[in-house]
Structures are given as C-alpha cells and as structure tokens.
C-alpha cells in the first residue's frame, strides 16, 4: 500500500505529521519534496490556466457578438 504523507525534519529524524499505518522497523522509501517549491510550481500552473481561461472567455464573447450582429 502506498500513501503520501507530510513530515517535518527535526534533529535528524523525519517525523510524520499524522499517524501512519506502519509496523515497527518497517522499511519504506521516502521521496523528499520541499513544500514551498511544489506550491510555487502549483501556483505558477494556476496563473497559466487563468490566462488560458481569460483567452477562451474573450473568444467566447467575440463569437457571441458576431452571432448577435448576424441575427
């Protein structure tokens, strides 16, 4: 079973921020991702999507104007 959890690194030890279902001594693989970097990339993608949405909405308005002018 795999899951993603948040942890804090303190005094050389990764400490989960919530209870995990592991047996004592169980070996796991850990992927380190800095939250700030992930969050920064996420917000950059959101800004990119907002710009795309604005372009689509602008095109939609123009098409409505053309339709209204014709009919």
Swiss-Prot record:
Gene3D superfamilies linked: AF2212/PG0164-like
One Pfam short name: AF2212-like
InterPro entries xref list: AF2212-like (IPR008203), AF2212-like_dom_sf (IPR024069)
UniProt keyword list: Toxin-antitoxin system
Biological function: Possibly the antitoxin component of a type II toxin-antitoxin (TA) system. Its cognate toxin is VapC17 (Potential).
Family per record: Belongs to the UPF0165 family.
Name assigned to this protein: Putative antitoxin VapB13
Organism of provenance: Archaeoglobus fulgidus (strain ATCC 49558 / DSM 4304 / JCM 9628 / NBRC 100126 / VC-16)
């Amino acid at each position: 079973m795999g899951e993603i959890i948040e942890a804090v690194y303190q005094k050389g030890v990764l400490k989960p921020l919530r209870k995990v279902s592991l047996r004592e001594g169980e070996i796991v693989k850990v992927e380190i991702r800095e939250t700030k970097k992930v969050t920064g990339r996420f917000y950059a993608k959101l800004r990119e999507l907002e710009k795309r949405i604005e372009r689509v909405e602008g095109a939609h308005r123009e098409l409505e104007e053309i339709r209204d002018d014709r009919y």
